[in-house]
Regions:
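Bacterial N-terminal signal peptides that target proteins for export
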Residues: 1-10
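Acidic, low-complexity Ser/Thr/Gly/Pro-rich repeat segments typical of extracellular/periplasmic
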Residues: 24-251
C-alpha cells in the first residue's frame, strides 16, 4: 500500500472519529461523508486501484448530505499521471447530494487516472470533508470492425454477400482504431490467395480492398482477416470470417446449336451410360457411375427403353442393340428371383442378390415393375418376322409371365407389398400405396395373364379408397391427386416412361393434368424461391430425389434443400416443354462446364454449399433419354400402350386411355 495513502486514510479516520464523538454545538459545522463513487457500473475502491473502467462513463459521487456546488466544482478533480486536470461538466441532483461529472472527452484507453476530492470541499451548511483520492485504470480498447461492406452490400455476419461481380471485388472495412500498416496486405485472406489493391484513409481506420482479377462464377468464397492484424497503438484483433457468392458466369460454355440438335446430344450422351458403361458381363445398368459390379433392376428397366431409343436414333446399330438385349435377358433369366420378382440390386457378375438393406435381400416388386415396363416396350419394338428377334420376344414373355404379382398381395389382401425376403419373409411390411411413383406396379399386376390381381387391390391398396385425391391448388395449379405441392418430380416420370398419360384418366384423376400441373408447381416454386436460394430462377429449376452434398435424399417444395437435379426438369419435357427446354439450355450452355459430363448431366448441384456432383445414377439418367423421346415422337408411349395385356389391365382397373 502507498505510504502517503496510508497516512491519509488514518488522518481521515481520526477526523471522522473526532467529529462523530464531539457533541455538536451552535456554530460547529458537521461532517460531510462520502456514500459511494461509481464510473459506469463499477464502484471505485479505496485504497486499491480499480481497473477495467469503461472509457466513456460518467463519474457519479453520492454524499451523505447536500454539497456546496461551487465548492464541489473547485475541489473535485480528475487528474492524469502528469498531474494535468481532465475537464468535465458538473451536474447535481435536486437535493444536491449527488454530483455527476461528465468528462468533455472519453477517457484514454488503458490509462491511469486519479479522482481527487480535497479537504476543502464543503457541504451546503459548511460541513467539512476529510478528503479522499481514488485511483483507477481504464480498459484496453476493443479493436473491432465498426462497418464492413462488399460491393456496397452489408457484409457483417450473419449476412453473406450475394451475386458479387466476377471481375471487380471491393471490400471496405472501418475499424475502431487506426491500423498498423506493417505487412498490411498479408492479413486479408481470400481463397486462391489473390493480391488486393489497398487504400487506407488518412486517419488509418478505414481500408478499402480491391481485386480486379477474375473470380469463378457461382462460387462460395471464404474471406478472412487474420487475428495477427494490429492497431497502430498495439491493440490486437480477434479475427474475422465470412463468405460470399459470386454471380452467375453467363458466358456460353459450349457453341450454340439448334434445340433439336441439343436434344439429340443429350439423348446420345445419356445413352452411353446404359450402353458404353453397362456392366460388361450382364449388360445391366450399374446403380451409379461408382458402383462397380452392383447393377440395378429398375434402372436397367429404364435402360432397356433407352436401348430402344438408341437403336431407333442410330446411336448404335440394331444388330448391336439386339446383341446387348440378349445379354441382359440371359442375365435376367438366370439371376436371383423371388417368386418371379428381381431384387433391387444384383451382382452383375454372379447374378446374386446384393442386399439393399438389412432385410431387403429378396424381391422388390416396384423395381421389378420398372423392368417389366421396359421389357414390354422393347418386345413391342422387336420384329417377330426375324427369328432372332422372335426368340427375344418369346423369352421376354416368359420373364413377364413368371412374375408372381399375386404372391405379393401377402395372402390375397387388397394391396401389393413392396418386398419379400426368403430370410425375413414380410418383415419389411411396406404396403405399396399411392399416390407416388408406384402406379405402374398395379397396372402391370392387373395386366398379368398368369398372376393377376383384382381391381379392388388397386382401389383399396394404391388409391386408398379415394385417399389419394387432393383437389387443392398450389401456385395457381390444381393438383388432382397426391401430396400437397405434388412431391418430388420422379412421381411424374418413373411410371410414365412407357405408360402414356396424355389421355389416361380414371375415377381419381386425369394423369395428364396431374403430371403437367405437378411439373408446373415444381417450376413455379423455384421461380418464387421462398428460401432465396442463390441459383433458382425460371430456367434453373427441378426438385426430385438425387444426390446431395450430404448423401442421397428427396427434394420437393415442402422439403426444399437448395439442390437442383437436372433430371427433374429435363424429364418433365413432355409436360412443360417451354420451361424444360429453357432448363436444358441453361444446364448445357450456362452451367455446362460443371454439370455436363461423360454420360450427360451430372446428378445434382447446390450452389449455396458450393457442391457440384460428379455422379450419374441409372434412375436419373434413364428418365431423361426416355422422356425426351416421348416428347419428340411418343415412341415409348406408343410401344407400351400397344401391348394387348396392358390395355386389358387398364380396362380392368377402370382407366380410359
Amino acid at each position: 500500500m502507498n505510504f502517503r495513502y496510508t497516512i491519509q486514510l488514518l488522518l481521515t479516520i481520526l477526523t471522522l472519529l473526532c467529529f462523530s464523538c464531539k457533541k455538536e454545538t451552535p456554530g460547529n459545522a458537521g461532517i460531510l461523508q462520502l456514500a459511494s463513487c461509481t464510473i459506469g457500473s463499477d464502484q471505485l475502491k479505496y485504497p486499491d486501484n480499480t481497473s477495467g473502467i469503461i472509457n466513456d462513463g460518467n463519474i457519479i459521487i453520492i454524499f451523505s448530505s447536500a454539497v456546496d456546488t461551487n465548492s464541489a466544482k473547485k475541489n473535485i478533480h480528475i487528474i492524469l499521471t502528469d498531474n494535468s486536470v481532465v475537464s468535465a461538466r458538473f451536474s447535481f441532483s435536486e437535493d444536491l447530494t449527488t454530483v455527476t461529472m461528465d468528462p468533455d472527452s472519453p477517457f484514454g484507453n488503458n490509462t491511469n487516472y486519479k479522482l481527487s476530492i480535497t479537504t476543502s470541499l464543503k457541504g451546503i451548511k459548511g460541513e467539512n470533508f476529510a478528503g479522499i483520492e481514488f485511483t483507477f485504470t481504464t480498459a484496453n480498447a476493443a479493436f473491432v470492425i465498426k462497418n464492413i461492406t462488399i460491393n456496397n452490400q452489408n457484409f457483417a455476419p450473419p449476412v453473406k454477400g450475394k451475386n458479387i461481380a466476377l471481375n471487380d471485388l471491393n471490400i471496405s472495412i472501418e475499424f475502431s482504431a487506426s491500423l498498423d500498416t506493417t505487412n498490411i496486405k498479408s492479413h486479408f485472406l481470400l481463397a486462391g490467395n489473390p493480391v488486393f489493391n489497398t487504400e487506407i484513409t488518412s486517419d488509418g481506420s478505414i481500408i478499402k480492398l480491391n481485386y480486379t482479377g477474375l473470380l469463378a462464377g457461382y462460387t462460395n468464397y471464404n474471406f478472412a482477416i487474420s487475428s495477427n492484424l494490429k492497431a497502430r497503438d498495439g491493440f490486437t484483433f480477434s479475427g474475422f470470417a465470412n463468405s460470399f457468392f459470386t454471380k452467375l458466369d453467363s458466358t456460353l460454355k459450349f457453341p450454340l446449336i439448334s434445340d433439336d440438335e441439343l436434344l439429340t446430344l443429350v439423348q446420345r450422351q445419356t445413352f452411353k451410360y446404359f450402353y458404353d458403361f453397362a456392366h460388361p458381363a450382364s449388360g445391366m445398368a450399374r446403380e451409379r457411375n461408382s458402383s462397380g459390379d452392383i447393377v440395378t433392376t429398375g434402372g436397367s428397366g429404364f435402360g432397356v427403353m433407352a436401348m430402344v431409343v438408341g437403336m431407333e436414333r442410330g446411336f448404335i446399330t440394331r444388330t448391336h442393340g439386339i446383341s446387348h438385349l440378349n445379354k441382359m435377358i440371359t442375365f435376367l433369366e438366370t439371376c436371383d428371383r423371388f417368386h418371379g420378382a428381381w431384387p433391387h440390386w444384383l451382382n452383375g457378375n454372379t447374378g446374386k442378390v446384393v442386399p439393399f438393406g438389412t432385410k431387403d435381400n429378396g424381391g422388390d416388386l416396384v423395381e421389378t415393375a420398372y423392368m417389366i415396363q421396359g421389357l414390354i416396350a422393347m418386345r413391342q419394338y422387336l420384329n417377330p418376322g426375324l427369328s432372332s428377334e422372335q426368340d427375344l420376344i418369346d423369352r421376354i414373355n416368359v420373364l413377364c409371365n413368371t412374375v408372381e404379382w399375386d404372391w405379393y398381395t401377402r395372402g390375397g389382401q387388397n394391396v401389393l407389398y413392396w418386398h419379400w425376403s426368403p430370410t425375413y419373409a414380410w418383415d419389411m411390411n411396406f404396403r405399396i400405396e399411392g399416390y407416388n411413383e408406384t402406379l405402374i406396379t398395379y397396372i402391370l399386376a392387373a395386366s398379368s395373364p398368369t398372376h393377376t390381381i383384382p381391381a379392388s387391390a388397386y382401389h383399396q391398396g394404391f388409391a386408398r379408397n379415394g385417399g389419394i385425391v387432393n383437389g387443392k391448388s398450389f401456385y395457381g395449379y390444381a393438383l388432382p391427386v397426391g401430396y400437397d405441392y405434388g412431391g418430388p418430380l420422379f412421381f411424374a416420370h418413373y411410371s410414365f416412361l412407357g405408360l402414356d398419360p396424355r389421355n389416361l384418366t380414371d375415377t381419381y384423376a386425369s394423369y395428364w393434368i396431374q403430371n403437367v400441373n405437378h411439373s408446373l408447381i415444381n417450376w413455379k416454386h423455384c421461380v418464387k424461391n421462398p428460401f432465396k436460394y442463390v441459383n433458382y430462377n425460371a430456367s434453373c429449376w427441378g426438385l426430385t430425389a438425387s444426390d446431395l452434398s450430404t448423401g442421397y435424399g428427396v427434394s420437393e417444395p415442402t422439403n426444399d434443400r437448395g439442390v437442383i437435379a437436372p433430371t427433374a426438369a429435363v424429364s418433365s419435357l413432355p409436360y412443360t416443354p417451354e420451361q424444360s427446354m429453357n432448363a436444358i439450355r441453361y444446364f448445357y450452355y450456362i452451367v455446362g462446364d460443371r454439370v455436363w459430363g461423360q454420360y450427360g448431366f451430372y446428378d445434382a448441384y447446390d450452389v449455396g454449399r458450393n457442391w457440384w456432383a460428379t455422379s450419374t445414377l441409372a434412375i436419373d439418367q434413364g428418365p431423361q433419354i426416355c422422356m425426351i423421346e416421348n416428347y419428340r415422337t411418343g415412341l415409348l408411349w406408343n410401344l407400351f400402350m400397344s401391348a394387348p395385356e396392358v390395355q386389358s389391365g387398364l380396362t380392368k382397373l377402370g382407366f380410359t386411355y
